[in-house]
């Protein structure tokens, strides 16, 4: 690469020397020349020259020339800027030629310009940027969008329009928005086209998309060349075309595409800003052009609406008439950038002069040695203050017709944004915007800059687009190539479990469960898929599935169809469809019947359940005794008798055979709730015990993967599957312990012989295979432990294949319609359906966790009943206690006690006596106390009356 760069620079230097020989001028002194006229170096010059380098006869050039003229008039008429200094503009035509453009740039340098507006062409920009670097003259390009015009390589090249780096990222986001994976790039084969498409390819790669083909044609290609190019890309798979060409010749592409039938349904055409430049320049719009372009999506540099912009567009007709241009030369966005570029130079000069800087030029000392050769380069002067002037330009920050004019550290305009337009029969219609701040939106970008940056996929939004063929639904974006090549399908040539995939004599050449699912999914696709099945393997042993996946990734096969397991390592090389059957690794081991245990009757409950249940029986007996003791003679008597009664009553409720009757309301309520709990416990115990005694109990030495790893005994795996690598790499099992087995017969033989007979202790394989194995073994074996990987089988396609997405959708549709189950029953129905796992008695045990809600309800009822009982007893005790003396009451009142009557002493011994008394006795005592109080009250009244009579009159 360095060699080619060196050759290019040498060639460029030689060309510059040849061009300079076109004029030979007297040698001037090497001293500095002041640009000012009749003034000292410290005063402002009376005029300053600015160059303009562009192609006159082009859509962009015609609009730019009007903008340049308007800008110069406005600047010189504005007394607030460049006071006393006139700005002159020197035009130079590049004629779309690198040679002529370079010559024109040198002629501009002859006029001692302080800056040059242009060039229009990116190719010319690469050449003349070397001139700018040498002579320190800033070039401000309003139309060269090539992203490789680097600010590091070309420090004096400044872009006042947007960098195509952002436009290519916008197109990439558009492709990603519709989930397309491949595009065809059609571009002009020059610096502008090649470099822009190169950036597009890099941007697509970041989104897991790609350019499937780059279709380049030379500048100025005729329709015949374009037709041959489009005919070749039409044979390819992708139907997404990104067109990046020049506006003056780009419409020919769509004219040819229309004749080839490439503008109909299923096609997607995306263009960069060139198309809207061409259409905007047509006044009025050509109906024939719109007819060609219906459904095309085009990008355009976004410029915010403003009063100044509207006023400038309103002047356009007068400007065109003044310059005697054709009536159909319309306004386009590059006119705005050209206008702003001139104003940028003027404003920068104003700041430059206000800082006390001057404009001076000097001869280039590096060109002195060329004088003796006869080639005179003395008119190429260095702008001495060019570096400072460039810095002033980069520091400018104001609002122009194109929006905020400010440059970032990479010398790009800030806030890049684009319009997205859909071409319809009535003209272009905006469907949204793109900016690097928010991605796609339907609101103008400047209204979103105040919000945080957000480019997440879920927040992207565009309005409805009408695609070619007047289709509303977004096209799929690809078809099968029209070059006659069918889909190459690799099918594993299995020697075992042939009902999944195997060789056959039918027209397809293969058959099986996986083949039927693939064929059923293919039939659901809305397009034909030519295909051919190719067996993979020698038929003597199962092939390596990892090798099959590698051949798909290497483009030997387009897809692998069969019992291919989806695992992480394989997804790095291929794309899998939605799984069509669940799978996972399990352990199969020999089993034998277990002997019945004499303690089986204890197995229905866990130890915790037995303990909690026993405690509850005792507790309910105590609660019933407390509630019934005062009412029921059966719960009274000597302490020994009462303890026996509590125990007997508690456990007899288990069988609903308690002989004691409950009398109190609270006791009956508690017993009712408890009997319901007992009913549930009894029923659950009976059901669990029945299951334990009736289900066949099987045992195995191997309880799962953990015991298998610890046993150091041989393990069998199916030859060709990923199980071997999983055991070795993930579980760190020694390879010497793993024995590959070829078919079902070897499986059964190895399990029956066992480790001592040269067999295996267990087999590790995928679940679908194990179901078939257990059925064919008459259920002599069982899986032990749990399934320790969970995955599935899918079809493996090449990376980024769009067919994988469509097939996944078809598989989901098969599942929803029940067709997957029908195919499964056709191929995977076995004579003996075996229970997969060994039944464990622990699975039938009932724990406290299953009953904690019921026990909680029971406890709450008991608590409420005991609370009501205690409240009643305390109330009775308060009424039966002896009356306190008046002196105690008086002392309490004098002390101001807040508790008042609550200071009465409570004797625990007296309280227990009240609790132990019969309810009838308590009621009798309360009645007697009430009568006594009544009599005492009457006596007090009589005594007071007698005292009143004895009082002297």
UniProtKB/Swiss-Prot annotation:
**All ranges on the Extracellular side of the membrane:** 30-606, 690-850
Gene Ontology MF term list: calcium channel activity; glutamate receptor activity; ligand-gated monoatomic ion channel activity
Keywords, A to Z, come to:
Glycoprotein, Ion channel, Ion transport, Ligand-gated ion channel, Membrane, Receptor, Signal, Transmembrane, Transmembrane helix, Transport
Q: Would you kindly state one Gene Ontology biological process term found in this protein's UniProt entry?
A: calcium-mediated signaling
Membrane topology value:
Multi-pass membrane protein
Q: For this UniProt entry, which residues form the secretion signal?
A: 1-29
Name any one Pfam family assigned in the record: ANF_receptor
Region of interest (Disordered), ranges: 928-953
Function (record text): Glutamate-gated receptor that probably acts as a non-selective cation channel. May be involved in light-signal transduction and calcium homeostasis via the regulation of calcium influx into cells.
Which PANTHER family did the record assign?
IONOTROPIC GLUTAMATE RECEPTOR
State the family it belongs to.
Belongs to the glutamate-gated ion channel (TC 1.A.10.1) family.
| Record protein name field | Glutamate receptor 3.5
To which species is this protein native?
Arabidopsis thaliana
Ranked from the top, the taxonomy reads: Eukaryota, Viridiplantae, Streptophyta, Embryophyta, Tracheophyta
């Amino acid at each position: 690469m360095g060699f080619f760069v060196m050759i290019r620079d040498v060639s460029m230097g030689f060309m510059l020397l040849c061009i300079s020989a076109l004029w030979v001028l007297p040698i001037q002194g090497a001293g500095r020349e002041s640009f000012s006229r009749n003034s000292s170096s410290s005063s402002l010059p009376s005029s300053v020259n600015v160059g303009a380098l562009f192609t006159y006869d082009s859509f962009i050039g015609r609009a730019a020339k009007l903008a340049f003229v308007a800008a110069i008039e406005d600047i010189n008429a504005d007394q607030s800027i460049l006071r006393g200094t006139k700005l002159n503009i020197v035009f130079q035509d590049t004629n779309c030629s690198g040679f002529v453009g370079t010559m024109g740039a040198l002629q501009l340098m002859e006029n001692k310009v302080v800056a040059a507006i242009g060039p229009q062409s990116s190719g010319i920009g690469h050449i003349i940027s070397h001139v700018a670097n040498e002579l320190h003259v800033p070039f401000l390009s309003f139309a060269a969008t090539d992203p490789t015009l680097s600010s590091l390589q070309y420090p004096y090249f400044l872009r006042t329009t947007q960098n195509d780096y952002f436009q290519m990222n916008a197109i990439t986001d558009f492709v990603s928005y519709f989930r397309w994976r491949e595009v065809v790039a059609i571009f002009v084969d020059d610096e502008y086209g090649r470099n822009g498409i190169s950036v597009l390819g890099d941007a697509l790669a970041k989104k897991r998309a790609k350019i499937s083909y780059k279709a380049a044609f030379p500048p100025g290609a005729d329709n015949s060349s374009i037709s041959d190019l489009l005919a070749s890309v039409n044979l390819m798979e992708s139907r997404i075309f990104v067109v990046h060409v020049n506006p003056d010749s780009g419409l020919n592409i769509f004219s040819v595409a229309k004749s080839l039938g490439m503008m109909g349904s299923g096609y997607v055409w995306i263009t960069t800003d060139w198309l809207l430049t061409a259409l905007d320049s047509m006044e009025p719009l050509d109906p024939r052009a719109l007819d060609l372009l219906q459904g095309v999506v085009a990008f355009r540099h976004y410029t915010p609406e403003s009063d100044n912009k509207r006023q400038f567009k309103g002047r356009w007709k007068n400007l065109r008439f003044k310059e005697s241009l054709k009536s159909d030369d319309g306004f386009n966005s590059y006119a705005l950038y050209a206008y702003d570029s001139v104003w940028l130079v003027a404003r920068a000069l104003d700041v430059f002069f206000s800082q006390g800087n001057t404009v001076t030029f000097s001869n280039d000392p590096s060109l002195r040695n060329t004088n003796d050769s006869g080639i005179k380069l003395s008119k190429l002067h260095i702008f001495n203050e060019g570096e400072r002037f460039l810095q002033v330009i980069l520091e400018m920050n104001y609002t122009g017709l194109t929006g905020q004019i400010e440059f970032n550290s990479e010398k790009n305009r800030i806030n890049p944004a684009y319009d997205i337009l859909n071409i319809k029969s009535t003209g272009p219609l905006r469907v949204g915007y793109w900016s690097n701040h928010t991605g796609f939106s339907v609101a103008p970008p400047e209204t979103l800059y105040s919000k945080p940056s957000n480019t997440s996929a879920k927040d992207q939004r565009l309005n409805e687009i009408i695609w070619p063929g007047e289709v509303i639904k977004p096209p799929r974006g690809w078809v099968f190539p029209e070059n006659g090549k069918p889909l190459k399908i690799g099918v594993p040539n299995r020697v075992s479990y042939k009902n999944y995939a195997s060789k056959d004599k039918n027209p397809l050449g293969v058959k099986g469960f996986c083949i039927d699912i693939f064929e059923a999914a293919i039939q659901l696709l809305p397009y034909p898929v030519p295909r051919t099945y190719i067996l993979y393997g020698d038929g003597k042993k199962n092939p390596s599935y990892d090798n099959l996946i590698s051949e798909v990734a290497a483009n030997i096969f387009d897809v692998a169809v069969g019992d291919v397991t989806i695992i992480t390592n394989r997804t790095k090389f291929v794309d899998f469809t939605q799984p069509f059957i669940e799978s996972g690794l399990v352990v199969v081991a020999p089993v034998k019947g277990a002997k019945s245990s004499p303690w089986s009757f204890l197995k229905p409950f866990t130890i915790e359940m037995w303990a909690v249940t026993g405690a509850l029986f005792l507790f309910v007996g105590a609660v019933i005794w407390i509630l019934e003791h005062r009412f029921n003679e059966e719960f009274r008597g000597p302490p020994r008798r009462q303890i026996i009664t509590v125990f007997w009553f508690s456990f007899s409720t288990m069988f609903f055979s308690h002989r004691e009757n409950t009398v109190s309301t609270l006791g009956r309520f508690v017993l009712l709730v408890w009997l319901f709990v007992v009913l549930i416990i009894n029923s659950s115990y009976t059901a669990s015990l029945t299951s334990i005694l009736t289900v066949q109990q099987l045992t195995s030495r191997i309880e799962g993967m953990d015991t298998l790893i610890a046993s150091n005994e041989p393990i069998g795996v199916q030859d060709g599957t990923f199980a071997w690598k999983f055991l070795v790499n993930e579980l760190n099992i020694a390879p010497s312990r793993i024995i590959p087995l070829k078919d079902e017969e070897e499986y059964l033989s190895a399990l029956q012989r066992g480790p001592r007979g040269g067999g295996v202790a267990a087999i590790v394989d995928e679940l679908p295979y194990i179901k078939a194995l257990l059925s064919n073994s008459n259920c002599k074996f069982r899986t032990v432990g749990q399934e320790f990987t969970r995955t599935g089988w899918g079809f493996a396609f090449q990376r980024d294949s769009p067919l994988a997405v469509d097939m996944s959708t078809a598989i989901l549709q098969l599942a929803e319609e029940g067709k997957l189950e029908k195919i499964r029953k056709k191929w995977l129905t076995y004579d003996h359906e075996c229970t997969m796992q060994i039944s464990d008695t622990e699975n039938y045990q009932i724990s406290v966790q299953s009953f904690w809600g019921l026990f909680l309800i029971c406890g709450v009822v008991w608590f409420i009943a005991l609370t009501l009982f205690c409240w009643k007893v305390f109330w009775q005790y308060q009424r039966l206690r002896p009356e306190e003396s008046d002196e105690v009451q008086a002392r309490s009142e004098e002390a101001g006690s807040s508790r008042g009557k609550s200071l009465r002493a409570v004797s625990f011994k007296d309280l227990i006596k009240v609790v132990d008394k019969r309810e009838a006795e308590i009621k009798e005592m309360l009645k007697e106390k009430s009568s006594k109080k009544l009599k005492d009250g009457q006596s007090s009244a009589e005594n007071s009356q007698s005292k009143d009579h004895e009082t002297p009159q």
